[in-house]
Structure formats: structure tokens, C-alpha cells
């Protein structure tokens, strides 16, 4: 099984506002960078989309170490999602899960991709080179959404 290290990040200028996502994928000596953006989005949507795009870029089942600075995404996929699904995509307080269509996409990728994923939280803006690069790519995504890239 291929070993892949992934760094993801999302950014938003205003919340909601124009946003971007960035991904760094590393496998051995190979490295690939991805980014994109949307107008009228939120930081959490961009954090989710970064992970979705990263996992969607993998062509075969991989052993993935995925670094992200979003506890919302990490806890959502590792702790909360099973409860949401049991409750018909509702939170513990009975409210509809926000960004449900993205959560469903991520759940499908995690469940059906054949990947073994180690979800690792990293403090954002704390000097981690992979996270800093993903952040720069996410900001490039904001510029792209605004037509400046």
C-alpha cells in the first residue's frame, strides 16, 4: 500500500465570503499541490473541501497520514459522524448537520476509498512547513475565486 502524507487547509476572507482550499500530497519523492476556491462560502466548507479534494485525488488505496488544522473536520469524521448518521444527519441537539452534502461526500470517500487514514491535528499558523504551504495554496484559491490568480 502506497504511503501518502497529506496537508490540507481552508481559508475564507469574511465568514461567509470568498474562500479557498489548499492541498499538499507527498508520496516518496513525489509532491503534488492542489487548490481552488469559491465565492460566498465559509471557512468550514473550505476545510472540508480541501480534505475531499485530497482524498479524491488518490488513484488507489493508500496508507494516508493526513494533517489538518481543523478540529471541526477531524472530530467530525472521527467522532461525530456516526452519531449524525444514526440521527438522520442531525446533531446531538436535533439540529440539521451543517454542510451535510460535503460530509456525505467525505464519508463516501473514507468508507469506499480503501484508504487507511491517520487523522492528525496540527496547530495552524505555528510554523509547520506542510501546513504553511497548504495555507498559502488555500489563499491562492481565494485569489482564484476573486479572479486575481
Swiss-Prot record:
Say where the protein is mainly found.
Answer: cytoplasm
Q: Which family does it belong to?
A: Belongs to the RNase H family.
* Compartments where found: Cytoplasm
Record keywords: Cytoplasm, Endonuclease, Hydrolase, Magnesium, Metal-binding, Nuclease
**Any one annotated GO CC term:** cytoplasm
Q: Which reaction does it catalyse?
A: Endonucleolytic cleavage to 5'-phosphomonoester
Cofactor mode of binding and number, as noted: Binds 1 Mg(2+) ion per subunit. May bind a second metal ion at a regulatory site, or after substrate binding.
Q: What is its EC number?
A: 3.1.26.4
Q: What is this protein's name?
A: Ribonuclease H
Q: Which gene encodes it?
A: rnhA
Q: Where does Mg(2+) 1 bind?
A: 9, 47, 69
- Record's superkingdom? Bacteria
Biological source species: Paracidovorax citrulli (strain AAC00-1)
Task: Give the record's subunit note.
Answer: Monomer.
Location of the RNase H type-1 domain? 1-143
Biological process according to GO: DNA replication, removal of RNA primer
Mind telling me which PANTHER family this protein's record contains?
Answer: RIBONUCLEASE H1
